[in-house]
């Protein structure tokens, strides 16, 4: 059984909306899960995020709904793909996104996540994109990554 399953993807101009199913017992992140996610994506902690505890995702990453983590992972995967197209990975310097130097003309990625029916584990995640194929891949990669780090 998978912790996270993409059940529907809709693409409209400049944004992609996914519906996901989250397995019972894995609906929220834990400090251990947050640590595994941050080990692969250190920049998650500094993502801007509207939440009740602070201005960044780092304030809530260890106790937030799993779809919220997936939203930020989709954005992180898009950022990585975009930056890798612009320049090859190299040594980490200030301003990097997980080891890839950020160019001056960054696209601003935005996203939202919400429960459609929390009791059934159904959620909606919406993100904007610069490239629809990159966003589609980002959703698939985020799903795969979460299923590799969530302990059922």
Regions found by a protein language model. Name each.
Residues 30-34, 81, 86-87, 137-139:
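Generic alpha-helix signal with a bias toward terminal, lower-confidence helices
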Residues 1-41:
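N- or domain-start disorder-to-order transition segments that initiate the globular core
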Residues 5, 12, 21, 43-46, ...:
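Generic serine detector
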């Amino acid at each position: 059984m998978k912790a996270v399953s993409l059940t529907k993807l809709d693409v409209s101009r400049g944004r992609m909306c996914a519906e996901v199913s989250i397995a019972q017992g894995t609906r929220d992140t834990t400090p251990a899960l947050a640590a595994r996610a941050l080990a692969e994506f250190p920049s998650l902690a500094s993502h801007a995020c509207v939440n009740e505890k602070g201005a960044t995702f780092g304030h809530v990453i260890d106790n937030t709904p799993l779809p919220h983590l997936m939203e930020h992972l989709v954005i992180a995967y898009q950022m990585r793909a975009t930056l890798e197209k612009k320049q090859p990975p190299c040594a980490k310097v200030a301003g990097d996104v997980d080891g890839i130097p950020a160019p001056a003309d960054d696209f601003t990625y935005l996203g939202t996540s919400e429960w459609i029916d929390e009791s059934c584990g159904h959620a909606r995640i919406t993100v904007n994109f610069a490239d629809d194929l990159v966003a589609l891949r980002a959703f698939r990669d985020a799903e795969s990554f979460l299923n590799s780090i969530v302990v059922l």
